[in-house]
Amino acid sequence: MNKYVRITEYQYNESRAYNLMKTVVGDWCEDLDGWVATWQILKTYSCEPDMGMDEGLAISPLQFFPGVDSHVVRHAKIRIFNLDLFQGDESFYYFVRMSKIAFSRDDKYWGYRFLARALHYIEDLSQPYHNKIDTDDKVLQVLDANYRHFLRRCHYAYDLFLAYLFNINDRKLLDAIENTPPIPCKDEKELVKKVREFSISKFEIVHDEIKRLFKDILWKRKVKMEDFQIADAKGQLEVLKEVTYQVISNFAGHTKYFLRKFMKEVRELN
């Protein structure tokens, strides 16, 4: 992942619709005479799907439901009772396929860039709030607008918690990413299944902890970084930290295996 590839123009006819007003096909990286490091492509463009490309689209009849937009449809795979709704898994599969197409053309730049997008979606699918919106006994309460705002703030709070752990260079979190060994999975579908099922199994404890820590705040406003700092100073984040280490470790292990296998398949790794 530490080699350089030449930046190439986007030349693909895709079946996937984007918000063209917020989709940039030019390069964002700091290149070196038209060349860019592969690790830099993966790091830079793994955030690209959150920059607006999936917003403002009419892609699913499920957008009829309150609080559901095209970004939600493409970045989540929500389980309600025994039903799995939305297209987060298809987003991952799609960009894995596009990456393979690019590598088959010897277009390494777009091979890595499409792969970076794929990694974004599998990371989304590893997160509890991208797989569940609430416990099944309370899911009908999402019809209430105030309760939907509360749940969105819960989701945002957990996203911010991950950012908090990275900001403080939490050693256990970094160890979970760096030192978890690859966990085998036979293909992309099994990868998605194993990552999602583990995430779903941890949803209730994550959700309960977020509510326990910040319930009074969440009914009024979004949680802020300083709220985590205060809670951490009081030793109140330990349960949330431990379950998060488990979620991240599971994601890291499965993704490492997938990447190694994928890189061999496209002949980027011996």
Each predicted region: which residue ranges?
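N-terminal, motif-rich segments that launch catalysis or mediate targeting to/interaction with membranes
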Residues: 1-104, 113, 131-270
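Active-site alpha-helical segments that house and flank conserved acidic catalytic motifs
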Residues: 110-132
